[in-house]
């Protein structure tokens, strides 16, 4: 699963997910992409589950770009532990997703197959998404 090799600090504040995605909001590498419509968190497991779904659907053809990376650690205290005594250990990694962020891109397969693969992948994700095509200027 995806996670940073090393970080400057082990733990992070919770923070708030506000605003829209300006960077990473256009299809840059492939021809068709999966774009988020709502905000949320995408865990490393969800990124991998969606990637596997796309890979299985398109079989050997085409190329996949994963445009998100889980760089935020989420901590959790064990069950039945009293409050205090510091922040819990890191449990998993997430990527904060803002509306408009491109999550996956595909190229080298038919548009119909790409739409099917991205629709299957979208069902694995905890927020609403849409399929967008690359706009050529």
Swiss-Prot record:
Q: Name one GO cellular component term.
A: cytosolic large ribosomal subunit
From what superkingdom does this record's organism come?
A: Bacteria
Its BP terms in the Gene Ontology are: translation
The answer, when asked if RNA-binding is one of the entry's keywords, is: yes
The record's listing under InterPro entries reads:
Ribosomal_uL16, Ribosomal_uL16_bact-type, Ribosomal_uL16_CS, Ribosomal_uL16_dom, Ribosomal_uL16_sf
Keyword list (alphabetical) reads: Ribonucleoprotein, Ribosomal protein, RNA-binding, rRNA-binding, tRNA-binding
GO molecular function per UniProt = rRNA binding; structural constituent of ribosome; tRNA binding
Recorded family membership: Belongs to the universal ribosomal protein uL16 family.
Q: How does it assemble?
A: Part of the 50S ribosomal subunit.
Known role: Binds 23S rRNA and is also seen to make contacts with the A and possibly P site tRNAs.
**By what name is this protein known?**
Large ribosomal subunit protein uL16
Q: Which organism is it from?
A: Psychrobacter arcticus (strain DSM 17307 / VKM B-2377 / 273-4)
Q: What is the lineage of its organism?
A: Bacteria, Pseudomonadati, Pseudomonadota, Gammaproteobacteria, Moraxellales
